């Protein structure tokens, strides 16, 4: 049986990160999606193109996605044949995240609707078009999913994670002293261990 993993990186990440996960995913080919825009209506075409290319060549397709990459994956591939997904610090509710950012920026939806875009002090540009797109394109996600979450994640709330877990076929692993971006030696070792276990369970199904 031929198996492949599609890897979708997060903001500021790289498709080359897929290489560092190969050691955790023995028996799988792995391909990273090289994208640089962060608008779902653009990224979806790149993700769909890669999926379409590998669909006929592999018996099973798995996903690994990081942060906003999880949102892009769910939006694009929700109706596709995915055996299992592994999400790292995932954006699971994009509308909730945008509304949180609106609050953090001390502006209102009305302000955003009138201005179209609002830059923030924390480096993100709020977009009314983006918020409308998210609301007009709800996601139905039925893929078995493993989630790795950090207790000190300053972007995604535990409440959002727990809500997703309760409404989906998903399992949660938490590194309590981890951060949204897993980057220290300790955090990366935890991530590697989690991924190896999740892949082993997956591949035995």
Predicted regions: what they are:
Residues 64-73:
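Gly/Ala-rich beta-loop-alpha elbow adjacent to hydrolase catalytic centers
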Residues 15-22, 44, 157-162:
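Short, surface-exposed alpha-helical segments at coil->helix boundaries
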Residues 32-57:
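Catalytic nucleophile-loop/oxyanion-hole region of alpha/beta-hydrolase
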Residues 81-205:
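The alpha/beta-hydrolase serine catalytic core
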Residues 2-3, 58-60, 83, 143-144:
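Short coil/turn segments at beta-strand junctions that form active-site/ligand-binding loops
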Residues 60-65, 88:
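Short beta-strand immediately N-terminal to the catalytic nucleophile in serine-hydrolase-like folds
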Residues 1-39:
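Short, surface-exposed "cap/lid" segments of acyl-processing enzymes
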Residues 76-80:
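Aromatic pocket-lining residues of Rossmann-like dinucleotide-binding sites
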């Amino acid at each position: 049986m031929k198996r492949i993993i599609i890897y979708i990186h997060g903001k500021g990440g790289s498709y080359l990160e897929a290489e560092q996960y190969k050691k955790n995913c023995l028996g799988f080919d792995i391909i990273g999606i090289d994208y640089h825009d962060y608008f779902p209506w653009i990224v979806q075409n790149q993700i769909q193109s890669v999926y379409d290319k590998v669909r006929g060549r592999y018996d099973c397709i798995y996903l690994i996605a990081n942060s906003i990459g999880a949102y892009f994956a769910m939006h694009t591939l929700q109706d596709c044949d995915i055996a299992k997904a592994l999400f790292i610090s995932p954006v699971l509710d994009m509308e909730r995240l945008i509304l949180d950012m609106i609050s953090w920026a001390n502006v209102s939806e009305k302000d955003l609707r009138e201005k179209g875009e609002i830059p923030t002090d924390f480096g993100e540009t709020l977009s009314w078009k983006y918020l409308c797109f998210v609301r007009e394109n709800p996601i139905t996600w039925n893929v078995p999913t493993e989630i790795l979450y950090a207790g000190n994640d300053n972007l995604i709330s535990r409440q959002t994670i727990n809500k997703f877990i309760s409404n989906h076929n998903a399992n949660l692993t938490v590194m309590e002293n981890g951060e949204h971006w897993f980057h220290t030696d300790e955090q990366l070792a935890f991530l590697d261990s989690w991924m190896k276990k999740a892949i082993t369970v997956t591949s035995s199904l």
